[in-house]
Amino acid sequence: MEEDLFQLRQLPVVKFRRTGESARSEDDAASGEHDIQIEGVRVGLEAIELDDGAAVPKEFANPTDDTFMVEDAVEAIGFGRFQWKLSVLTGLAWMADAMEMMILSILAPQLHCEWRLPSWQVALLTSVVFIGMMSSSTLWGNISDQYGRKTGLKISVLWTLYYGILSAFAPVYSWILVLRGLVGFGIGGVPQSVTLYAEFLPMKARAKCILLIEVFWAIGTVFEVLLAVFVMPSLGWRWLLLLSAAPLLLFAVLCFWLPESARYDVLSGNQEKAIATLKRIATENGAPMPLGKLIISRQEDRGKMRDLFTPHFRWTTLLLWFIWFSNAFSYYGLVLLTTELFQAGDVCSISSRKKAVEAKCSLACEYLSKEDYMDLLWTTLSEFPGVLVTLWVIDRLGRKKTMALCFIIFSLCSLLLFICIGRNVLTLLLFIARAFISGGFQAAYVYTPEVYPTATRALGLGTCSGMARVGALITPFIAQVMLESSVYLTLAVYSGCCLLAGVASCFLPIETKGRALQESSHREWGQEMVGRGTNSAGVPRSDSGSQE
């Protein structure tokens, strides 16, 4: 086979339109046409078998034909009305996720008093949600890769809506424990909205738009606190659970408009559906479709865990798992630490305060006051500066450096908490730390869907989300249990963990800034041919992504 390929020695210069990932680098010439000297004797391309056993697609038999891939169409159509609608719709799912998470800090103390629950049962009510999320994240990613992004997202949202509403009618503790665990199981699939959303975005708008739906997370947390301020004193926690499901209900009503990812359709061989979706986007945006024939990527197994550990992605997967673990571990740890630090006034007062306080009955409780809700509100508002900072730097520094910057600044703020400082400085440090650790989360949500190919994108994001839930499960034992014995050791654990995450971000093999979304885990055969020609004839080659 190699002899056949390299016998192409005496053919004249041909001109063809470059397609696929190699044509979509930001540094490519605008024309997209290149002269390549091919020498040798023509052979029948349709019958050639590549080294990996993949037949050459017939679409490439005549290289002068106009062809395009989904990425080319998305770039040509651009950002418009369709993407704005999609932003709002996927943002609703993200907002609902934030509200279901924020309600944990409101529901737990209420049930602690109303049902006279011991402290360990209150803690279990929070932990069971994270257990559900951790156990389902990989499953939802697999479903989205196997059966479609739209299918996985719709099922997870409807699942969460159903059990979220049932939670409001739970008669006893055991019922609400099971139902909230099932809610957590459904929430584990909501991050797949990022996968679907990213696959419809042109390259230059992708980072900003993914950060845009992260704003919906911040809006959801603020809205949940405001809702609790007005609902809890008069109507109670059952009505709060019902009203908190409103964004999910709205999504369920509007999801009939949601299209399936054209990238997924192409990868699964549904060319007609992919073209129909692209034409629909072009019509809504008032933009023309690219001329030519849509190239169907070679079909391959989707949603296989082993694909995350191929030589090309093994190191990336392991580093991302640690980064996501550290992110959630530190984010939720800071949320828990904030209450303790505010109550004590500063770090130096915590140990003495805990020694002075007599042991209390585990059934003793206090309902949240309006002042408590306002403190929660001010804390959640720190999410917005994190979005703004990440939005400003992510396309300037790149994804890897942005994550590293956020983790390192959080680590420094944690170390500064060792100093005996006043409440005002304490508040400032906590807000800066919260802003940057949330910014690290946002940057990770941009990077992860970009680095994996379409065949494993949902699974990759799902497994990373699952590792984040492991961090969220562990962090109460550090922020609450370890804090009882040593506040300095607790702060050192969070600071050290994020410092290591910053180093891990720098060691990620691939920088995705200015890089097109990869359609397949294998190179397109056209790229393979150009690569071989480069080695033998010195023709320059454009990579679709940079590796450092």
From Swiss-Prot:
Q: Where in the cell is it found?
A: Cytoplasmic vesicle, Secretory vesicle, Synaptic vesicle membrane
One Pfam family this sequence matches: Sugar_tr
The question of whether Kinase is a record keyword is answered with no
Q: Which segments of the protein form a coiled coil according to its record?
A: none
Residues where Phosphoserine is found: 25, 31, 542
Name the residue ranges with Polar residues bias. 533-548
Q: Identify the NCBIfam families for this entry.
A: 2A0119
Provide the protein name.
Answer: Synaptic vesicle 2-related protein
Which organism does this sequence originate in?
Answer: Mus musculus (Mouse)
Q: Which taxonomic lineage does the organism of this UniProt entry have?
A: Eukaryota, Metazoa, Chordata, Craniata, Vertebrata
| Gene from which this protein is expressed | Svop
